[in-house]
Amino acid sequence: PHLALEKLAALIQELDQVVLVGSSLGGFYATQLVAKLAVPAVLINPAMQPWHLFRDLFGATQLPYRVNEHWTLDDAQLDYLEQIELPFVQDADKILVLLQQGDEVLDYREAQRYYNGAALVISETQGNHAMEDFADKIPMALQFLSDCLK
């Protein structure tokens, strides 16, 4: 996670008019990058406290967990995610959060509590972690991001 965020931050700083779209863990990362670099983002069912999620998912007996030949998830990485957690959302006016209450992986209420009152949050009943009908939301997401860049 540290290297991924470091590389993304460096790339963002080299480019003009960057916007982010992050889903699940990507939503957690995007929240960090918005706070650090003030870039706009659309978050789709963002993971809250992903270190808990991964530890619950894999358990101590399965860590380190080999994701693929190039990446292994271990306790040090999960500890890092916990250390960088932001106690409150920053630059919230640059964040659109899309939640679906039928998310079978994450508890949408955690994200709703964290972002509500700060960022623009749209919470739909039903749905799933993959964000049902996402294609229908693309025009709204693009309009939000475009407005943020003006």
Stretches with model-predicted labels:
Residues 40-148:
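The alpha/beta-hydrolase serine catalytic core
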Residues 33-37:
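Aromatic pocket-lining residues of Rossmann-like dinucleotide-binding sites
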Residues 1-14, 129:
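Active-site catalytic motif of lipid deacylating hydrolases and related acyltransferases
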